[in-house]
Amino acid sequence: MNNTIETILNHRSIRSFTDQLLTAEEIDTLVKSAQAASTSSYVQAYSIIGVSDPEKKRELSVLAGNQPYVEKNGHFFVFCADLYRHQQLAEEKGEHISELLENTEMFMVSLIDAALAAQNMSIAAESMGLGICYIGGIRNELDKVTEVLQTPDHVLPLFGLAVGHPANLSGKKPRLPKQAVYHENTYNVNTDDFRHTMNTYDKTISDYYRERTNGKREETWSDQILNFMKQKPRTYLNDYVKEKGFNKN
């Protein structure tokens, strides 16, 4: 097993960072690593906003659900779906492509491009001995996040990425068994296979939480996920995404 694979398999989310900020060189390396990710048809439909202003980080921390590691980290990055530059290019050349930019396919392209870039950055950061934590909470109140970051139409903040020097290492959460996520040639809908896999995984997760909390928590993955799914969804996003110029047709 090489160092790259070891880094990937050793991933865990870090939610406690030291006060040490990333250097300009480290930030540059991380951004270059993100840019090296694959991109659909060379469109590069994403942007990264680095947030170093302490007040902006504090505001984003509150908007993300009062998550302290949004404010206290080595550097905070926000990954955005970005079709603004493409719209600007078209306008400068007298082309009219708004309807094309605002369709579902381009929305999906921008989402995937941003996610690929972010994962490249994450792996690069962890290979440098840094820790990372993805922050989906910025989608709680995207209209206010947009104000903080001053993003124009055709730019949509998707998630944050806190990066820094770990203050402590959390345990690695067991992932779903391979047979739950990998299907050969066709999707496996066998009910018995599903039930066996989920029961086995639920016991693994229950044992993990019991050991981690000295018996104070024994929640299964099934219970955890179903409870999460029943929480109030961000239903406003459907309209807001369209308002920002995405997924209109």
From Swiss-Prot:
Keywords, alphabetical: Flavoprotein, FMN, NADP, Oxidoreductase
InterPro entries: Flavin_OxRdtase_Frp, Nitroreductase, Nitroreductase-like
Description of how the protein assembles with itself and partners: Homodimer.
Additional free-text comment from the UniProt record: Catalysis proceeds by a classical ping-pong bi-bi reaction mechanism. NADPH is more effective as an electron donor than NADH.
Top EC class, one word: oxidoreductase
E.C. no: 1.5.1.38
Pfam families, A to Z: Nitroreductase
Reactions that this protein is recorded to catalyse: FMNH2 + NADP(+) = FMN + NADPH + 2 H(+)
Recorded GO MF terms: FMN reductase (NADPH) activity
Organism, as annotated: Bacillus subtilis (strain 168)
Task performed by this protein: Reduces FMNH(2) to FMN, with NADPH as reductant. It also reduces nitroaromatic compounds, quinones and azo dyes.
Family: Belongs to the flavin oxidoreductase frp family.
Phylogenetic placement of the source organism: Bacteria, Bacillati, Bacillota, Bacilli, Bacillales
Name the record gives this protein: FMN reductase (NADPH)
PANTHER family: NADPH-DEPENDENT OXIDOREDUCTASE, OXYGEN-INSENSITIVE NADPH NITROREDUCTASE
